[in-house]
């Protein structure tokens, strides 16, 4: 359970106040060892829903959604021999917040603001989580574009040294973040 305090205006705007909200997470993790020939492999799966909670208000006549997120992850670890191990991982994330309706060409600003209040801001945070799966104006393709995914691999030698690399992908319509990652690590025993 978490308490959220957000003061985005920094007291520079007299028309807004600090926002307050509460949120919680739900997570599930499964881990199993499988025999692949003579090798004992590890298969792991996890699900996490983060920031399930209230909406946040900054002193206006409507509240904003906090970034509720659904994450799914899968990992497979394969021992090569007594000293070497390689792991492969995949991860998918989707924001569980409804898409804000777009303003229609013939719609006045006042009519659009009223439609936002009726169709977007008045939705509860829990209802918003469920409607986020079917609210894209681009249909199923748009819903699939809302999913960010990542893949990665890690090599470990003697549980002492590791090398890892990965790739993250986000649709151009959702922010267009695409990047590779790399890293190394070592275990150091200290008295």
Residue map of PLM features:
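Outer-membrane beta-barrel porins/channels
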Residues: 1-191
């Amino acid at each position: 359970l978490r308490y959220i305090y957000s003061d985005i205006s920094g007291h520079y705007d007299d028309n807004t106040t600090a926002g307050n909200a509460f949120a919680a997470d739900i997570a599930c993790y499964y881990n199993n060892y499988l025999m692949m020939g003579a090798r004992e492999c590890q298969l792991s799966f996890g699900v996490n829903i983060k920031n399930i909670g209230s909406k946040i208000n900054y002193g206006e006549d409507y509240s904003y959604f906090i970034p509720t997120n659904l994450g799914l992850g899968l990992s497979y670890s394969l021992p090569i021999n007594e000293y070497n191990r390689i792991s492969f991982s995949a991860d998918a994330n989707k924001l569980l917040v409804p898409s804000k309706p777009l303003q229609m060409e013939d719609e006045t600003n006042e009519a659009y603001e009223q439609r936002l209040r009726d169709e977007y801001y008045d939705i509860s945070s829990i209802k918003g989580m469920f409607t986020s799966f079917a609210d894209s104006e681009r249909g199923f393709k748009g819903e699939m574009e809302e999913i960010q995914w990542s893949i990665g691999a890690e090599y470990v030698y003697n549980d002492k040294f590791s090398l890892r690399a990965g790739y993250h992908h986000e649709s151009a319509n959702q922010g267009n973040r695409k990047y590779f990652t790399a890293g190394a690590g070592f275990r150091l025993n200290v008295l």
